[in-house]
Design a protein with these regions (language model features):
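N-terminal accessory/interface modules of nucleic-acid-binding and processing proteins
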Residues: 1-339
Length: 339
């Protein structure tokens, strides 16, 4: 992987710090490592920009660990434009921003052009070029870290009512109903476009990778609906790693042998994080499974000692959640014939 600059290294350290704190919190909180409490998914305040899955989990952990009412974030420059400022001694959270401002000829690496020049080319010429991705690290601040609550109390309170924790909102019943509808819609779309889902009478939720089938008990068999949702989302994420979908290393069985133990533990980390992202979109807190709880120290150590792991996590979590989004949009997720 490309060598990180100092800013990227500092961002990675901050991300690892947030994950480590979250895993430690899980030990004290019956496995809950991302207490979402009904907050809507992370977003940039007053901006209609898509937030990647990995950025979303980083922002979500930051909001949860600091007890913020919403997952609404802003740039320092944007706050300034609105007549606000970041409060003193507040520490931002890293947001990974990708640009494709330069393009290179697929047949001649010396031939590079700007984005504007690329867009001016006819479509048949554009096919000869591919984008060069560059990464920037931006610092974001939760709106509670700014002076918004004081400068424009009305706007702040309206934002909390629309995006905040259930305990801070007036429409609790409607919000709770929306959460259930979100889960059922996800399952319907996934069943229709990605993977077969069957009811399981044994009471044990599981994914059969050989048959590519999810077996899920009825919601009524769970004491808490949130646990049903967690099992459902976790199994959907697991299914994205199938050898004929994203083919994550920890999911692949070669010559009848399972992946190495480290790969299996890494797959478990990817599954838990991607599951948390999707649950966060639904407004549900993420809870580690008992099997995952025993891996938290290993994950924390590996994230700290292996600088490449945070990048692998970003890539695989983004890919898994993007695949679920594709199914939700009504696009078919076909199995790849090549394994």
């Amino acid at each position: 992987m490309t060598e990180k600059n100092q800013q990227e290294k500092m961002a990675a350290e901050r991300q690892v710090e947030l994950f480590t704190k979250a895993f430690e919190k899980a030990k004290e909180n019956n496995g809950i490592w991302l207490a979402n409490d009904g907050r809507k998914a992370p977003a940039l305040y007053q901006k209609h920009l898509q937030v990647s899955a990995f950025n979303a989990i980083v922002l979500g952990m930051h909001a949860a660990q600091n007890g913020y009412k919403t997952n609404q974030y802003t740039l320092f420059s944007e706050a300034k434009k609105r007549g606000e400022s970041v409060q003193s001694k507040e520490k931002g959270v890293p947001f990974l921003w990708y640009n494709w401002n330069e393009y290179v000829n697929k047949h001649n690496p010396e031939d590079k052009i700007s984005r504007a020049d690329y867009q001016a080319l006819p479509s048949n010429r554009q096919a000869d070029y591919k984008g060069i991705r560059s990464r920037e690290v931006r610092a974001l601040f939760n709106i509670e870290q700014t002076t918004l609550p004081m400068v424009d109390k009305t706007a702040y309170e309206a934002t909390v009512q629309e995006h905040g924790r259930l305990s801070d909102r007036n429409d609790v019943e409607c919000a709770s109903t929306a959460i259930r509808q979100g889960v059922e819609n996800l399952l319907d779309k996934a069943r229709e476009n990605m993977v077969e889902i069957r009811s399981d009478s044994t009471g044990v939720a599981h994914y059969d990778s050989k048959k590519d089938i999810i077996f899920l008990p009825k919601a009524s068999s769970y004491e808490h609906y949130e646990d049903y949702a967690r099992d459902a989302v976790s199994l959907l994420v697991t299914a994205t790693g199938h050898g004929q979908r994203l083919a994550r290393e920890g999911m692949i069985i070669k010559n009848g042998k399972a992946s190495a133990e480290d790969s299996i533990k890494q797959e478990r980390l990817i599954t838990e994080v991607a599951t948390a992202v999707k649950l966060q979109e639904l407004g549900i807190s993420a809870k580690l499974s008992p099997e995952s709880m025993v891996m938290t120290d290993y994950w924390a150590r590996e994230l700290k000692e292996n600088p490449c792991l945070i990048d692998i996590l970003e890539r695989d979590v983004n890919n898994a959640v993007d695949m679920l989004h594709k199914a939700e949009r009504g696009e078919k997720v076909e199995l790849n014939s090549k394994t």
